[in-house]
Design a protein with these regions (language model features):
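Left-handed beta-helix
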Residues: 1-136, 340-501
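Conserved beta-loop-beta/alpha segment of the NTase-like Rossmann-fold superfamily
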Residues: 5-10, 14-15, 210-296, 343, ...
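N-terminal glycine-rich phosphate-binding loop and ensuing alpha1 helix
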Residues: 24, 36-38, 51, 58, ...
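Short beta-strand segments
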Residues: 142-143, 192, 243-246, 275-279, ...
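Residue-level signal for inorganic ion chemistry
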Residues: 173, 229, 248, 290, ...
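Residues at the starts of beta-strands that form the adenosine-phosphate
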Residues: 187-188, 241, 400
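A short, charged helix-loop
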Residues: 293-329
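Short loop-to-beta-strand entry elements in the cores of soluble alpha/beta enzymes
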Residues: 328-339
């Protein structure tokens, strides 16, 4: 049926054909041509927008992590577990996935005025001098882990903090050391680790003073690790302020990070347990949250607020609701406080744990034999609990916990999906951790491939896969299920594959 018959009224007084009918048909034909052409143009624009959006996301990740191009390396014949020790923390070591790397040494800007990324106050001042060192401030790096979340890339003997998982030429703990060194110097930078990791940490951090490497006999979660360091440092310097920062987190934006830590130290000196709240970039269900309370009104720390409450990892709907309010920040597990205040909180909320840690600290620097004896007696009976649950949450209810909101980039690299976000890639292509020459793909989008065995990994027509090919183990899963890898580790252990863990 013609368009004219559909739209031209029919009556006995009007002809069904003629000049008018032809002109109407021609008009609608032109309209249809325009509509079809517009549809084609819109489809093309949508395609271009999609490509631009994907390219922008890739570029943002690269800029955020300081990566401007993917570093390619010749074939490595080893699993790449160890990052060889540098001659100094300021010299970049070889990556376990790269043949060589030329990353610039850590630079300390000469200015003491740093632009703040926090909305209300555009500029804050470092009162500690141009080298950023903060007198009386000690850094504690808890370095633990069972190597389950990035298995089989990470193992019990080589957890993720010992690996260069971002192709930057430094392991995560080396990057953490580099980041915090300007605030303290090596003399006031301590690491808490288990006996199985002490040797590797000493090799990767040759400037770490041995009396600042605190070996805990077994894992007791973050409260015992941080509490042990606090108790020891309190014996050495009762006026010390300590900051605890995990060994295996990724941080981008050094100026913003140092700005937030410096502000947290100023607040801690006023008698608070201070955490640093990360501005959430998406409604994550894998992180805990901090709810912002009233501003503290401290002139030297204008961004600091009370912590209204801590929230456990929420479901997706709750996380989205948190972000919509603008009053929540991710809880990154960074805490800054006076050692005496932390121990006072511990005595109040966990007196038995506090008593045990103080017994150990009392003999720590006296005699190694006596230290080991007390550790054998005390450590097995200590409560296994996180610092959040032990002191931060109950203290927040009494108005004794503060938060410094910050906007530097942060990720705890909790699974292969989050690791993939930190690596560069072409649009719609999988991320490659290692030698990209060992990976061939055809019609493959997203995902991450770790060619750790040295053999070729070929993928055809699969999207968002996680493929970790090590000399002794092959893992294949999806990015959506990557948080469940630790279930496989448990199953491997129960099935007698303990040697692969």
């Amino acid at each position: 049926m013609s368009l004219s018959r559909l739209f031209v009224p029919q009556s006995s007084s009007e002809p069904t054909s003629g000049p008018n009918a032809l002109s109407v048909e021609a008009m609608f034909s032109q309209i249809m041509d325009v509509v079809l052409k517009s549809r084609a143009e819109i489809a093309e624009l949508r395609h271009e927008c999609t490509e631009l959006r994907q390219a922008n996301l890739s570029l943002e990740r690269q800029v955020r992590e300081g990566i401007t191009s993917q570093i390619r390396s010749p074939h490595l014949g080893t699993p790449g577990f160890n990052t060889p020790a540098p001659s100094s923390p300021q010299l970049r070591a070889k990556s376990p996935f790269l043949h060589s790397s030329s990353i610039p040494t850590l630079a300390v800007p000469p200015s003491v005025h740093i632009a703040s990324p926090l909305g209300d106050n555009t500029v804050i001042s470092y009162p500690y001098g141009p080298n950023r060192e903060i007198p009386g401030f000690y850094v504690v790096i808890p370095a633990g882990g069972a190597g389950t979340r990035l298995w089989p890339l990470s193992r019990e003997g080589h957890p993720k903090f010992l690996l260069d998982v971002t192709l930057q030429g430094r392991s995560l703990i080396q990057a953490t050391w580099d980041r915090l060194l300007p605030l303290t110097g090596a003399e006031r930078l301590a690491v808490v680790a288990g006996p199985g990791h002490v040797k590797s940490i000493s090799e990767q951090l040759p400037d770490l003073l041995q009396h600042n490497l605190f070996c805990e006999p077994g894992p007791k979660d973050s409260m015992a690790a941080i509490g042990l360091a606090a108790a020891i440092l309190a014996q050495r310097d009762p006026d010390a302020v300590i900051g605890s920062f995990a060994a295996d987190h990724m941080i981008s934006g050094t100026d913003a990070f140092l700005s937030a830590v410096s502000e947290a130290v100023l607040v801690a000196q006023k008698g608070y347990l201070v955490t640093i709240g990360i501005a959430p970039s998406h409604p994550s269900t894998g992180f805990g949250y901090v709810r912002l309370g009233d501003k503290l009104g401290i002139p030297e720390a204008p961004n600091a607020r009370l912590v209204s409450s801590f929230k456990e990892k929420p479901d997706a709907r709750t996380a989205a609701a948190y972000i919509a309010t603008g009053s929540y920040r991710w809880n990154a597990g960074m805490f800054v406080t006076k050692v005496t205040f932390l121990l006072d909180l511990l005595r109040e909320y966990k007196p038995e744990l506090a008593e045990g840690l103080m017994k150990v600290a009392a003999v720590w620097d006296v005699d190694e034999g006596q230290r080991n004896k007390v550790l054998e007696e005390v450590w097995p009976g200590l409560e296994k609990i996180a610092i959040d649950h032990a002191v931060a949450e109950p203290a927040a209810l009494e108005g004794r916990v503060a938060v410094v909101p910050a906007t530097f980039g942060w990720d705890d690299v909790g699974d292969f999906s989050s690791l993939a976000e930190l690596l560069p890639a072409e649009a719609n292509q999988p991320r490659i951790l290692g030698d990209s020459g060992l990976v061939l793909t055809e019609q493959v989008a997203g995902g991450i491939v770790v060619p750790g065995s040295g053999r070729l990994v070929a993928c055809l027509g699969v999207d968002d896969l996680v493929i970790v090919d090590m000399p002794d183990t092959l893992l294949v899963t999806t990015r959506a299920r990557s948080q469940e890898v630790k279930r496989l580790v448990k199953k491997a252990k129960d099935s007698g594959w303990r040697r692969l863990l």
